[in-house]
Amino acid sequence: MTYQQFVGDAAFRRHYWARNHLGWRHMEAARPNAAHMLLARWERCGAVPGVITQNVDLLHLKAGSRRLVDLHGTYAVVTCLDCGLRQSRWALHEQLDRLNPGFTERVATRGAIEIAPDADAVLTDTADFRMVDCPRCSGVLKPDIVYFGENVPAHRVQEANALVDGSDLVVVVGSSLTVLSLIHI
């Protein structure tokens, strides 16, 4: 999904939030693997000063990493594009449940809910789903995740650069480093 798709089309945005409403808890339930745990252990013993991740899944945090730069953001926070209000994804989930009573049950009656690799539910019909606006300014709410076509916020780039600049060695795990946001760090 691109940033322009998300901000430019209310129907596309509604479809995204309906899919995400059913699927995001699968990501929330995910647990760190051995690599996440090892990096957190290395940080605790001083072998690495911190972790920079492109992933939005919070697995490094769950593993115990303390100095963590979520370069591409996290699914656990929702931000208003107009006023900048930040709220937890859990808070938005509760609001969406109230606004869409029975939505999950209606979808479940159509069969098993398939979850895509991006942790969103695979849905075709989301026309009856209702999305909330920002409670402060009625603006558009977006997950605090960097989409294609969107820049990584400057403060995250600065944090990542500071972490790299203060290191003698950089260990790369699970990345080809070909994503533009990492090439210059």
Describe the role of every protein-language-model region:
Residues 1-184:
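Conserved catalytic core of sirtuin-type NAD+-dependent deacylases
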